């Protein structure tokens, strides 16, 4: 996952991905 971006690892929360990094 990437900061500030929705990706396959999960949605972002407070600028950080919900799962993964």
UniProtKB/Swiss-Prot annotation:
Ranges for region Disordered: 1-21
Signal peptide: none
GO cellular component terms attached to this protein's record: extracellular region; nematocyst
Subcellular compartments: Secreted; Nematocyst
Keyword Transmembrane: no
Major site of localization recorded for this protein: secreted
Function, in words: Injection into mice produces severe neurotoxic effects such as circular movements, aggressive behavior, dyspnea, tonic-clonic convulsion and death.
Protein name: Granulitoxin
Organism lineage string: Eukaryota, Metazoa, Cnidaria, Anthozoa, Hexacorallia
């Amino acid at each position: 996952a990437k900061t500030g971006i929705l990706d396959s690892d999960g949605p972002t929360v407070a600028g950080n991905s919900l799962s993964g990094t």
